[in-house]
């Protein structure tokens, strides 16, 4: 997402009751987008950065006013730096060993990534051994029709990517996708 479209796209998501917006650091000018969103939404929405893979990024996103750091991997150094900077910290994990290491490092929640490679039965097995206070969020390949299975397995939420927004999408397309995810969440709540 670019700074030119970030406010309009994000407003469409907020209108659909999305309360957390993550700007991937591999986007064009991500720090500028984060600063714009923080200024625009103030405390109404949690603004964060995704694809956080180094210590320099932690400093940059904290200075930009982000409140959330999401990583594709589990790095003890990055988790500790993010926590020291006051950020909500969600590292990526794929195994129980990685999950326990990130919990010990101070992670606030865990990103099960890539979820395409970890079907709901894997999440259920992980939830059986991990502390119940730690939320697990499947990310990667999540679509509205997959939400119910993951929620039944114990998902505490989801990270949404290209099924919600891809470069070049219009605001209306993103709003339609947001509606589809909201419907998927309602269906999964009824199925529980």
Where are these regions (language model features)?
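Small side chains
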Residues: 10, 157-159
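Conserved anion-binding
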Residues: 29, 44, 56, 62-149, ...
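Conserved N-terminal beta1-alpha1 strand-loop-helix module at the mouth
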Residues: 1-67, 74, 84, 144-145, ...
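Conserved acetyl-CoA-binding loop of GNAT-fold acetyltransferases
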Residues: 18, 107, 154-157
């Amino acid at each position: 997402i670019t700074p030119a479209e970030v406010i309009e796209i994000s407003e469409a998501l907020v209108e659909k009751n999305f309360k957390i917006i993550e700007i991937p650091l591999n986007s064009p000018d991500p720090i500028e987008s984060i600063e714009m969103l923080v200024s625009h939404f103030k405390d109404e929405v949690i603004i964060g950065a995704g694809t956080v893979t180094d210590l320099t990024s932690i400093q940059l996103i904290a200075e930009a006013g982000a409140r959330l750091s999401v990583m594709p991997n589990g790095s003890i150094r990055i988790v500790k730096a993010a926590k020291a900077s006051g950020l909500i910290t969600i590292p990526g994990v794929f195994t129980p060993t990685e999950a326990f290491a990130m919990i010990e490092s101070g992670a606030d929640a865990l990103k099960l990534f890539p979820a395409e490679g970890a079907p709901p039965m894997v999440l259920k097995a992980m939830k059986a051994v991990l502390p119940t206070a730690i939320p697990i969020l499947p990310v990667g390949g999540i679509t509205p029709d997959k939400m119910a299975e993951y929620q039944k397995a114990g998902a505490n939420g989801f990270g949404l990517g290209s099924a919600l927004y891809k470069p070049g999408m219009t605001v209306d397309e993103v709003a339609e996708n947001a509606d589809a995810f909201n419907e998927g969440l309602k269906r999964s709540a009824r199925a529980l």
